[in-house]
């Protein structure tokens, strides 16, 4: 059980919450702050003060005063009218993440909701009732209004949820779990939907997958180095310390550890003086992608614990301030950066695939075919990889450079951060498939070189891979092989043992 405080949530905890289904509870001190802040909102309503989002309309209607008797209707109307999401739903892990992050930001005690609202969000998390949230429709400022409105709907007993493996009406799940839908009161609708939790939840899942994929890329690249009898000198510690990038040094170190007892790597001048860049520059390129990942992780962990709604309440109600923390620009930039960093792992992987299948670049059978000419072998796998990296180049175009004014030009600059997050996740799926193709080719090359000559680590990795797909002894439908390896990499290859390279993988 992970305790939410509003201040301390980490990526490592989100892994447990999203991928392992761990439960959550609220810190009592944080809940006390929530209750105290709520008293301020109720006094504002009682006194009839004019405060944006509490006693006024929203967006361009911020100058419209709402009567005390209409405050509840205002919140309900807000949720229904803003639930304009379209397209396929986010993965369940993302909608679960949205619930967790929304509760966490409310626990900072500056949003003005009742403790009841926070508790309801946590009930949904712990009972694994996950909102069906369409992926499209957010501008990323004022936050993720449309996606979060679909999240808020289910608290009211409206909309749809994923529950026990099925997509059902929210009331079906609430009834089965013995929960009553809530009725929103002053400010609560706005507090639920005005924030960056859709782009951030998708960003967190993307980061978690990207981190695992980046480690896997090192094991796969190491197997390719063996298949091509690569020069190990290029990974010498002195080379990488001379440049000074920590991540580059770490990648080189891990690859040296993976290959330390390999009989397939060569020394400088033994077969050739230098390798091509796609082998020789693995630490430089992969290391640069790790720099991106480290940047993204830092920004996500800030945003996961950020108050992103509007207005915010401070000093016991002395200050109720309309600001712009809902603006998703920091996450938009981070996700666009993640797109580029991950796309580059696929770019260099595809070039290594080419070196594995092109007989002009190696002494292996053409296209790793068991019977060149009669059988095409891995020829079209390289085409597929080329297609995926080309698609990534389109997806990697920065969403954050775009902005379209909305709400009659009141909201005249927006982040498009949710688009960036969604595209980052798609790029990661493509990268994993490119790496899957490289792994299939590298395993085949290893067989030609002699499996007994592989390092202890790559040999273990090879045998696990062969449990997913057989050797290429005849042409077959290779799309199945690619998807099988990709699924295995995504779901069954633990990164927890990534640094213990002598352990069984």
From Swiss-Prot:
PTM sites of type 2,3-didehydroalanine (Ser): 142
Q: Which top-level group of life is the source organism from?
A: Bacteria
Give the record's keywords alphabetically. Cytoplasm, Histidine metabolism, Lyase
Q: Does the keyword Transcription apply?
A: no
Localization per record? Cytoplasm
**What does UniProt say on post-translational modification here?**
Contains an active site 4-methylidene-imidazol-5-one (MIO), which is formed autocatalytically by cyclization and dehydration of residues Ala-Ser-Gly.
| Gene3D superfamilies hit by this protein | Fumarase/aspartase (Central domain) (1.20.200.10), Fumarase/aspartase (N-terminal domain) (1.10.275.10)
One matching Pfam family? Lyase_aromatic
What does it catalyze? L-histidine = trans-urocanate + NH4(+)
Q: Which GO terms describe its molecular function?
A: histidine ammonia-lyase activity
Q: What is its main location?
A: cytoplasm
Q: What EC designation does it have?
A: 4.3.1.3
Q: Where is this cross-link: 5-imidazolinone (Ala-Gly)?
A: 141-143
Q: Does the keyword DNA-binding apply?
A: no
Offer a single GO CC term for the protein.
cytoplasm
Pathway assigned in UniProt: Amino-acid degradation; L-histidine degradation into L-glutamate; N-formimidoyl-L-glutamate from L-histidine: step 1/3
List the GO biological process terms: L-histidine catabolic process to glutamate and formamide; L-histidine catabolic process to glutamate and formate
- Please report which protein family the annotation says this sequence is part of: Belongs to the PAL/histidase family.
Listed PANTHER family: HISTIDINE AMMONIA-LYASE
The protein's name is Histidine ammonia-lyase
Please give the organism.
Answer: Bacillus cereus (strain AH187)
- The gene coding this protein: hutH
